[in-house]
Amino acid sequence: MTRSPCSTTSRWISSMSTSEYRAVDAESDLPISAAELAALASQLYAASIRPGPDSPPQQAPVAPRGSVPDATAATSAGRTAAGTADVYPGPVPQVGGRDVYLPPPASPAPEAPPQAAPPAPRGSAPDATAATSAGRAAAGTSDVYSSWVPQLGVADIYLGAPTPAGPEAPPQSAPPAPRGQVPDTTAAATAYGADLSAFAVPTGIVSTAPGVQAGTAPPVPVVPRAATAPSWLPEAPSVADLGWSDAPAPDAPAGDEHDYHFLTKTDPVPQFRDEHEVFDVAAIRSDFPILKETVNGKPLIWFDNAATTQKPQVVIDRLSHFYAHENSNIHRAAHELAARATDAYEEARDTVAEFIGAPSSDNIVFVRGTTEAINLVAHAWGAKHLQPGDEIVITHLEHHANIVPWQLISQKTGAILKVAPIDDAGNLLLSEFEGLLGPRTKLVAASHVSNALGTVMPVDKIVELGHRYGARVLIDGAQSIQHIPIDVAELGADFFVFSGHKIYGPTGIGALYGTEEALTETPPWQGGGHMIADVTLERSLYQGPPTKFEAGTGNIADAVGLTEALRYVQRLGVERIAAYEHALLEYATPRLADIPGVRLIGTAQEKASVLSFVLAGHEPLEVGKALNAEGIAVRAGHHCAQPALRRLGLEATVRPSFAFYNTFEEIDVFLRAVRRIAEGGANVG
């Protein structure tokens, strides 16, 4: 992955001699010499670190601050008693402000002298058991780490038991447990990997056509359809497909070919195996602290994922670590914290580019979210390239964020906004869409997934048709980025936009992907610091993409948090997430449709996550309040998609929407609550 060019200041920092800086932080007060320190680190490394089969030989990490305690109790009894999610398998040394993971050493042979315990984390801790159990239990949080070291486990990293040095060696202690109790591995594999019926896709799903006909669109067939997986899902999803054993590829270490800015670099640790041997929803849920909340005395059931997703602990920890250890402005200072923050921010850009398949990090512009990204294209690209009589084509399914900006720029430029229709099931009428395209079409903008109905749009065909008529094409990925594997190079769109908070990241951060050609022909839309190359009182010269679109101080911390969210999703696997969420949707759809008075809204063949409905005799807001009384969070309203709902003769719907941390049991609770409301047994109003 190529990295965006760095500022002169940051390059100067990178070129400074390492001899000008101590090998460890200034706070360190080690009672041994540097040579002894290196020897100790080498000994510990040789005794304890077990690289993966593809890992290159690693340089020994530097020992941490403080004395070396007895770590046996810390790694086994301490963490087990705490019941919290340590994100490393052993004590964490801190080297030059960077954390290094050091696993516990292998057991010695029967007659060998005891091995030295691993070094203690962050200062001296004479009683490691008390430090681990009492300290972390009181804090209720896991230790944080720097962005240089990849965190591979979603809860704790499971390590296989080390091979004993001799036949008489004592048994090994169990690997660290995640948040909560870990069942026996064999039982877990049987419970989650062998019983496929729990994840079976129901059959006989009935498409419920709305009772309102609009326009000349053909009606939805009322015959039942087969429950078939969308084309973007893996074939024949099952529990076996939801598990995996291959470890994720390790991050490439920073070399001379990259523009990393850290003054003190550490070698990456060996790659550990991810602990989730199967798609264990219970273990995944333990990574999301908010799911332990109660609402009105009931366990929280978060079915409002189309509005925003909840955040895993690793994202929360990463944000905290940034503000505790890296907080600074970026690209424009000659000190250590600026170097750390700059590197973390640019690493976030690299991560986004990799996640969506962009050819370069220079294709990624950080914005506040999808709405700002679309406005950037409309008011920067559109203001330059749209003339009176030119045409913009959108669809009837769009979120207001993909309607209003085009209305505004059309009013300013005299362009014409055209809208492609949908049928009563919520499908785009592709032939009608193509009929709107012509020689004056300059831009096509369409959602990948409808936020109101869940319809998966044929974006590959939309891009192909748009380009056939010479138009630029923008795809709104706000509702697809978290559910569907994205490859922008394969898709071929000129622009692709999404929000971080929709994919388990922080709010206030999102990304605009643009091809090199599209970004080059787009002028800056805001002026200020950072985006300039040179300024005089008479004129200004601008940087190239993506810098010219990022005036002022960006949302640095939340970009760094987005990095961790995307890595979390990558560890689980987007294809596995898609298969599991589709199973949830196919399970809920026929059971909800079977409740008297329920009418499903949006019954397209290919859907993702969203299950909109109305209930006869009840306003959607009443249903939403009644469900909230049961601890169930859904959206009730027009979902910022009034044209789509009005096309179907409605002003509002109830919209549950699913994510990979939701369960079939939660769906059952939801269905029972809706049935009670329908039968008059719930307090509505």
Swiss-Prot record:
<feature type="compositionally biased region" description="Low complexity">
    <location>
        <begin position="71"/>
        <end position="85"/>
    </location>
</feature>
<dbReference type="GO" id="GO:0005886">
    <property type="term" value="C:plasma membrane"/>
</dbReference>
<feature type="active site" description="Cysteine persulfide intermediate">
    <location>
        <position position="640"/>
    </location>
</feature>
<comment type="function">
    <text>Cargo protein of a type 2A encapsulin nanocompartment involved in sulfur metabolism. Cysteine desulfurases mobilize the sulfur from L-cysteine to yield L-alanine, an essential step in sulfur metabolism for biosynthesis of a variety of sulfur-containing biomolecules.</text>
</comment>
<dbReference type="GO" id="GO:0031071">
    <property type="term" value="F:cysteine desulfurase activity"/>
</dbReference>
<dbReference type="InterPro" id="IPR015422">
    <property type="entry name" value="PyrdxlP-dep_Trfase_small"/>
</dbReference>
<feature type="region of interest" description="Disordered">
    <location>
        <begin position="162"/>
        <end position="185"/>
    </location>
</feature>
<dbReference type="InterPro" id="IPR000192">
    <property type="entry name" value="Aminotrans_V_dom"/>
</dbReference>
<dbReference type="InterPro" id="IPR010970">
    <property type="entry name" value="Cys_dSase_SufS"/>
</dbReference>
<comment type="subunit">
    <text>Isolated from bacteria in a complex with encapsulin 2A (AC I3NID5), strongly suggesting it is found in a type 2A encapsulin nanocompartment. There are 1-2 copies of this protein in each encapsulin shell.</text>
</comment>
<feature type="modified residue" description="N6-(pyridoxal phosphate)lysine">
    <location>
        <position position="502"/>
    </location>
</feature>
<keyword id="KW-1003">Cell membrane</keyword>
<dbReference type="Pfam" id="PF00266">
    <property type="entry name" value="Aminotran_5"/>
</dbReference>
<keyword id="KW-0663">Pyridoxal phosphate</keyword>
<keyword id="KW-0808">Transferase</keyword>
<feature type="compositionally biased region" description="Pro residues">
    <location>
        <begin position="102"/>
        <end position="121"/>
    </location>
</feature>
<dbReference type="InterPro" id="IPR015424">
    <property type="entry name" value="PyrdxlP-dep_Trfase"/>
</dbReference>
<comment type="similarity">
    <text>Belongs to the class-V pyridoxal-phosphate-dependent aminotransferase family. Csd subfamily.</text>
</comment>
<feature type="region of interest" description="Disordered">
    <location>
        <begin position="48"/>
        <end position="135"/>
    </location>
</feature>
<dbReference type="InterPro" id="IPR015421">
    <property type="entry name" value="PyrdxlP-dep_Trfase_major"/>
</dbReference>
<keyword id="KW-0472">Membrane</keyword>
<feature type="compositionally biased region" description="Pro residues">
    <location>
        <begin position="164"/>
        <end position="178"/>
    </location>
</feature>
<dbReference type="GO" id="GO:0030170">
    <property type="term" value="F:pyridoxal phosphate binding"/>
</dbReference>
<keyword id="KW-1284">Encapsulin nanocompartment</keyword>
<dbReference type="GO" id="GO:0140737">
    <property type="term" value="C:encapsulin nanocompartment"/>
</dbReference>
<feature type="compositionally biased region" description="Low complexity">
    <location>
        <begin position="122"/>
        <end position="135"/>
    </location>
</feature>
<dbReference type="GO" id="GO:0006534">
    <property type="term" value="P:cysteine metabolic process"/>
</dbReference>
<feature type="region of interest" description="Cargo-loading domain">
    <location>
        <begin position="1"/>
        <end position="282"/>
    </location>
</feature>
<protein>
    <recommendedName>
        <fullName>Probable cysteine desulfurase</fullName>
        <ecNumber>2.8.1.7</ecNumber>
    </recommendedName>
</protein>
